[in-house]
Each structure stands twice: as C-alpha cells, then as structure tokens.
Amino acid sequence: MKKKLILAAAGAMAVFSLAACSSGSKDIATMKGSTITVDDFYNQIKEQSTSQQAFSQMVIYKVFEEKYGDKVTDKDIQKNFDEAKEQVEAQGGKFSDALKQAGLTEKTFKKQLKQRAAYDAGLKAHLKITDEDLKTAWASFHPEVEAQIIQVASEDDAKAVKKEITDGGDFTKIAKEKSTDTATKKDGGKIKFDSQATTVPAEVKEAAFKLKDGEVSEPIAATNMQTYQTTYYVVKMTKNKAKGNDMKPYEKEIKKIAEETKLADQTFVSKVISDELKAANVKIKDDAFKNALAGYMQTESSSASSEKKESKSSDSKTSDTKTSDSEKATDSSSKTTESSSK
C-alpha cells in the first residue's frame, strides 16, 4: 500500500513539475481561434488543493534530496522500485500501465523514489531515542509466537468452525478446507507473528497473545480499515512465549519499535521538516503558494505580524509598569503629606 501511494503521489508531482518547469509561452494545445500555453495551464492548476500539496511535497523533497541525497544508493532505489513493481503485479496489475496512468516512466519514477529515500534518511538523521521511548516500546512488545489461524467471512461461519474444533475436529484439516486466508491455508493455517507484525490484524494479535499453548480462541472479529470489511478468525496457539522482565534479549526489536513509533509521530515529522526548511532558507516567490508550507514555516507577513504583536505586548507591559510606578509614587507622596499635617 505504501508503494502504491508513493506511485500516486509521484504522478501528481510529475504533472505539476511539467507545468512549473516548461517554457511559459510554449503551446500545450491548439485549436481554431485559440491556444493553451504552459502559463495558461500553470495558472489554472496552481490554485487547486492538489497542486498546493504537490508543490509542498516538491519543495520538501528537494530540500531533503539536496542535503541527504548522497546517503541513498542505486541499490536502495532499485530495491524500492522492485517492491513497487511486485506489489502492483501481485494485485493483478501491469506495472508499465500503472506508470503510464501516473504520467511516469521508469526513469522519472526512480527519481521520485530517490527523493523519497532521501526524505526518509533525513527524518532518521534526526532520530534520538530516549530511555523513555524504549520503555514505552517495551510495554507494548510481545515476542514472536507460533500459531494457526482460520479466517472466514461471517460470524456464523466462525462459530461453526469453533464448534467443530471443540467437538474434536482437527484444526489443520479444517484450516485447509475452510480458511479464506490464502497465505496460510495450504499449510493448515500455520503462522508466526509478534506485536509488530502486519500479517495479521491487531485484534487477532491482541486475542492470540492471551492464549496458552494448545488453547483455541473464540471467534475474533477484525475490520479492515481500508475496505471496512469485517472478517472473522479462530486462532490456535502453538507456542506462546512470555517476554519476562529483561529487555536486553529483545534490544534490537525494541529499538526498531521506538524508531518506527517516532517516525510515525506527526509532531516529530513536522518539527524536522520545519527545521530543514529553515536551514535551507526556503522562500516562496509566488503568492499563489504562500500558504502551501504554512504548517512548517512562517511567512514574512505572519512573522512581521507576530513581531508586531510582541512589540505591542512589550509596550503595554512597559506602560503598565510606568503607571504602576506612578501610582506607587503618588500614594507614597500622599502618605507623606498626611504624616506632615499630623
């Protein structure tokens, strides 16, 4: 899914790049009595929200590529390219058609992948994992377990499967006959997963980790958040391992969890982007895009407004202080006069 999204985003950027980088007077289309130039097209699309997003991403990726591009190897790019291709083909699509639909060639797509990889490298360069981060990761961690699963379409089917197993049915045989999970069905539902695995839904992991060896779960409902379809699972635990109290044997896994958690934290990501844009001295020259990066950087007008507010606040505080001092002096003088008259 991630590669699919990258491909789609790359397509949007490719269209915008074409308009932004081509000669403004060049004709894109001609017709009787009129033409459409690159400038016409650019002025039309730049106000659209998708163009604002594409521009924002273009600037961010360019900044990160300039600074972190040398950390990305051709091997990294080819690996990401192959993964994207495999994913499209696994879903029955043709990769060349997907590229054409996005307005890309293999060369331009690889360029986009390099920018994305440089962006990822830039985020990782800012990572600082604390002991608190590790403790948080440890709290939700569960070591890898060995289990068997049966996936079915309805709750009634799941209840029927559970009853069949309870009545002495062989789990492996039932999985091969009735499970709809194509990845595990042939092997009798056998699967391994830990708390970070994406091969099984979170609901299934949560229920499975509570099972003892040999125990079979009740039907578990799991909703796919992309399709909003609910499927049902019955799980048999083969080998469940308690993590204990010592984090050290799982140090590598815990650190990875902490890093992934921070990289998914939008506050962290926004701060990194903001710092990098500031360091690169990014200036927006076209008013149509002055707010495209507003979430990451202050515009000159907003900065001036902020300074003006601070100045007013400071003047107000100074005035209040002077007034207070004057009142104190008047009060003191009054008391002195009263004392003299007495």
Curated annotation (Swiss-Prot):
Keyword hit for Cell membrane: yes
UniProt feature, compositional bias: Low complexity: 331-342
Record-level Gene Ontology MF annotations: peptidyl-prolyl cis-trans isomerase activity
Segments for region (Disordered): 297-342
Superkingdom in the source lineage: Bacteria
Residues with lipidation of kind N-palmitoyl cysteine: C21
Subcellular localization, as worded in the UniProt entry: Cell membrane
Biased composition (Basic and acidic residues): 306-330
Membrane spanning residue stretches: none
InterPro entries for the chain: Foldase_PrsA, PPIase_dom_sf, PPIase_PpiC, PrsA_foldase, Trigger_fact/SurA_dom_sf
A GO cellular-component term linked to this record: plasma membrane
The entry's keywords: Cell membrane, Isomerase, Lipoprotein, Membrane, Palmitate, Rotamase, Signal
EC number: 5.2.1.8
Catalytic activity, as annotated: [protein]-peptidylproline (omega=180) = [protein]-peptidylproline (omega=0)
Top EC category: isomerase
PpiC domain boundaries: 142-235
Lipidation (S-diacylglycerol cysteine): C21
GO terms for biological process, alphabetical: protein folding
Membrane topology note: Lipid-anchor
Signal peptide: 1-20
Coiled-coil segments on the chain, per record: none
Function: Plays a major role in protein secretion by helping the post-translocational extracellular folding of several secreted proteins.
Family: Belongs to the PrsA family.
The protein's name: Foldase protein PrsA
